[in-house]
């Protein structure tokens, strides 16, 4: 296969879900990303492999599921890639691309392991990232290059000195949350961070145009998982794993914009990018390339289902799911409340309001009709279960079990998993104290000391 030698600008955010105007949120101000979506390929059924930061990002950058690459929990709790796992920057560096990272990464406490030629992860607030990334783009190395710009936004918190909140009156509260003043205000603050980060992306896009690099650069925008709200982040519902993903081809390809409505998994990003760049896809990659569909507008689906997983967040909470265009089937492997809220959500206004409402025991199995019930509010495997629902669930369960076997997905016992989670969490708290450092954009506060590559 002949490499195309195009550049790649990859921009990723925290905790956004699909909260952009381009995804049907008119109450969100995101004009630059909406424009990017109109100019490129807007993915409407992209799903993270996991509803939390490190496992999701691990799949996006390796093309492998968390149980395969080893990143089944949060990097700042001590989880790391398995030895020998190669990332997108590793692969592109070996193929002749110059690779650089500015800002957020949440895959490791040792960023030099990620395979970039140069990196500065010391500060991941969007203005710092964009200042350094635009300077880098003004005098880039000899192409081709991969430039990754990682924003801390839109992770909690949303301090007003950084983000001017939207008008709470205009906020549309999602169906899975009660419509209260505190929740509206919380969403308004979230929207404020979106607007600031959107403008920062605009500066990157403007720099590409001003330098002429937009003619030869693939622009990829993505987030890791759903927003930090109850029944979104840290769950395997659509609001938890559904992600914004936009790909704009180089201007010189004259590729027509499109809305891509096929199912797309986080593990598919790496093989799709390699294919678009004309590079061979390594044999250990578990994702599928969608490049042919994106370039030729073919309508043959690449995949008919996506698989999602959660094992460790701030606690041991093992869940697996399979999702088609018509149904979502979830298996819960431990006795837990309806929602096991991670720290950042539990301490938020929506978390405090919702916590008393989600203490009932979670069912072992869940099935949702995504055509009739897109917000996944009525479990078809409840007391009113029908023969049809049971049959559909059984078929999906077989596919899920087959996928777990193929990916060597071993779920620890309740005793072992809980002890493992406690060990990682206790070590994290012993090192960092009660301050939750994952909510900081400053790498040194997150336990990452070697935050610059030599020369940065």
Where are these regions (language model features)?
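Formylglycine-dependent sulfatase
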Residues: 1-359, 365, 374-398, 402, ...
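Small-residue-rich loop/turn and linker elements
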Residues: 416-421
């Amino acid at each position: 296969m002949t490499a195309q030698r195009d550049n790649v600008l990859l921009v990723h955010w925290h905790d956004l879900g699909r909260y952009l105007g381009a995804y049907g949120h008119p109450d969100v101000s995101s004009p630059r990303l909406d424009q990017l979506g109109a100019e490129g390929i807007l993915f409407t059924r992209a799903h993270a492999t996991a509803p939390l930061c490190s496992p999701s990002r691990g799949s996006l950058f390796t093309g492998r599921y968390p149980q395969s690459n080893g990143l089944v929990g949060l990097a700042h709790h001590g989880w790391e890639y398995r030895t020998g796992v190669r990332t997108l920057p590793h692969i592109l560096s070996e193929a002749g691309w110059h690779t650089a990272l500015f800002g957020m990464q949440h895959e490791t406490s040792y960023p030099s392991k990620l395979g970039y030629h140069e990196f500065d992860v010391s500060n991941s607030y969007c203005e710092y990232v964009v200042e350094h990334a635009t300077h880098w783009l003004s005098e880039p190395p000899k192409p081709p290059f991969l430039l990754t710009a990682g924003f801390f936004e839109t992770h909690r918190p949303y301090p007003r000195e950084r983000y001017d909140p939207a008008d709470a009156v205009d906020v549309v509260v999602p169906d899975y949350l009660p419509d209260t003043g505190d929740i509206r205000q919380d969403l308004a603050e979230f929207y404020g961070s979106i607007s600031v980060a959107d403008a920062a992306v605009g500066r990157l896009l403007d720099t590409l145009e001003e330098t002429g690099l937009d003619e030869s650069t693939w622009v990829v925008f993505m987030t890791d998982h759903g927003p930090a709200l109850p029944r979104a982040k840290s769950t395997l519902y659509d609001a938890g794993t559904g992600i914004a993903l936009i790909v704009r081809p180089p201007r010189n390809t004259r590729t027509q914009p499109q809305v891509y409505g096929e199912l797309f998994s986080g593990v598919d990003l790496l093989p799709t990018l390699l294919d678009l760049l004309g590079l061979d896809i390594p044999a250990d990659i578990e994702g599928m390339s969608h490049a042919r569909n994106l370039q030729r507008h073919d309508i043959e689906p690449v995949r008919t289902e996506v698989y999602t997983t959660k094992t460790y967040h701030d606690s041991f909470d093992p869940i697996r799911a399979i999702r088609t265009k018509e149904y979502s089937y979830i298996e819960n492997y431990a006795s837990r409340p309806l929602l096991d809220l991670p720290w950042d959500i539990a301490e938020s206004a929506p978390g405090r309001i919702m916590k008393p409402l989600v203490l009932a025991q979670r069912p072992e199995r869940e099935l949702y009709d995504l055509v009739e019930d897109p917000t996944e509010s009525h479990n078809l495997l409840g007391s009113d279960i029908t023969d049809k629902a049971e049959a559909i669930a059984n078929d999906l369960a077989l596919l899920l079990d087959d996928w777990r076997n193929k990916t060597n997905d071993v779920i620890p016992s309740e005793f072992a998993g809980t002890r493992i989670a406690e060990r990682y969490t206790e070590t994290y708290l012993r090192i960092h104290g009660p301050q939750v450092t994952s909510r900081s954009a400053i790498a040194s506060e997150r336990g990452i000391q070697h935050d610059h590559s030599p020369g940065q």
